[in-house]
Amino acid sequence: MSSEREPSIPEVTDLGLTSDCGSCFGLCCVALPFAASADFAIDKDAGRPCPNLQQDFRCGIHRDLRPRGFTGCTVFDCFGAGQKVSQVTFDGQDWRRAPGTARQMFDVFPVMRQLHELLWYLAEALTRPAARPVHAELRAALEKTERLTRGSAEELMELDVAAHRGEVNALLLRTSELVRAGVPGRKKERRGADLMGARLKSADLRGANLRGAYLIGADLKGADLRTADLIGADLRAADLAGADLTGALFLTQSQLNAAKGDAATKLPQSLSRPAHW
């Protein structure tokens, strides 16, 4: 028997995937563009600081973002990419004191966010006992992705993120199939389905494939979404009051932040109940 010990869950998941705004140079408030809409009160070009960003890189209206028309800011999650770019890639050198780094820093940020998002999914996949047949491949992909996040700014800019994402996604698909195979009964295949405003109250969606599904404004009150694959599903304004998301696959904090729910909504242990619910 091999003496090699499989990494424990804390070792796998301790990857800095939780946003630490205090260690970031306000990158999401500068690097990314947004347009006046239901999510943002104003237009802002990429690379231009939001007028609410203060000199210390904190938000001047953080406590009032939703009533002031900046709901989108409360939904966004960088998976810890902001502090990685700020403190690791650029070694704590901020774009205000070193304006020559600004353009490159802003371009690297979305690349890093994609890599950190993949780390989130891979770390979760490794916690799934049913996915044990692909754990070795998942672990190798996680280690490769983590190494990529520690590359130089130049290396990150040259990285073919789409190709790497495709490799990882193939493993995530296999993970999903293995995990959902353990759910009894016929599973619903609604990958990429247009379910905007759908009436799915109390629906049995256990083990459903809802990858990339459009669930904007859907009524999911009391729905059973245990072990459903929700990677990339659009849950904006979806009503999850009383829904059971226990064990839902590849659900992220930003998806929950975009949805509606209540104290009765059951969540995976790795995620937090949004303050606005």
Locate predicted features.
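Tandem repeat scaffolds
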Residues: 173, 181-277
